[in-house]
Amino acid sequence: MTERTLILIKPDGVKNGHVGEIISRIEKKGLKLVELDLRTADRETAEKHYAEHSDKPFFGELVDFITSAPLVAGIVEGESAIAAWRQLAGGTHPVEKATPGTIRGDFALTVGENVVHGSDSPESAEREIGIWFPNL
């Protein structure tokens, strides 16, 4: 089934020069980039995006990090795009769960700065795309 998913290349991925390689991996996976935007997220957008974590002790740090510098927000489309992107991204915790050869396995050093984000379900994708690309 053709799906769309939100992707974020977080500030650490932009700062460390991984944007080109990440986009290349997306295209090699057969996924299509339908939107791509370099921007610095504002607090309101970040807080909406991470609302499910608002009661967690790391929420403030997460919002501070994602708004600290430019990131790339995008929409990727393709067959089972959500699962395909999550497979490319690798596990959330780069040391314990991200396999070498995945984006996080190759580029991330900590769970807090783990290079990329991707929606985890069709419902999350719809919600997150609406937050980052409200005019679509």
From Swiss-Prot:
It is an enzyme of class 2 (transferase). Its cofactor is Mg(2+). The keyword 4Fe-4S does not apply. It comes from the Bacteria. It catalyses: a 2'-deoxyribonucleoside 5'-diphosphate + ATP = a 2'-deoxyribonucleoside 5'-triphosphate + ADP; a ribonucleoside 5'-diphosphate + ATP = a ribonucleoside 5'-triphosphate + ADP. One of its GO terms (molecular function) is ATP binding. The keyword ATP-binding applies. GO terms for biological process: CTP biosynthetic process; GTP biosynthetic process; UTP biosynthetic process. One of its GO terms (cellular component) is cytoplasm. PROSITE patterns: NDPK, NDPK_LIKE. ATP binds at K10, F58, R86, T92, R104, N114. Its EC number is 2.7.4.6. The active site is at H117. It is found in: Cytoplasm. Keywords: ATP-binding, Cytoplasm, Kinase, Magnesium, Metal-binding, Nucleotide metabolism, Nucleotide-binding, Phosphoprotein, Transferase. Belongs to the NDK family. Major role in the synthesis of nucleoside triphosphates other than ATP. The ATP gamma phosphate is transferred to the NDP beta phosphate via a ping-pong mechanism, using a phosphorylated active-site intermediate. Homotetramer. NCBIfam families: PRK00668.1. This is Nucleoside diphosphate kinase. It comes from Corynebacterium jeikeium (strain K411).
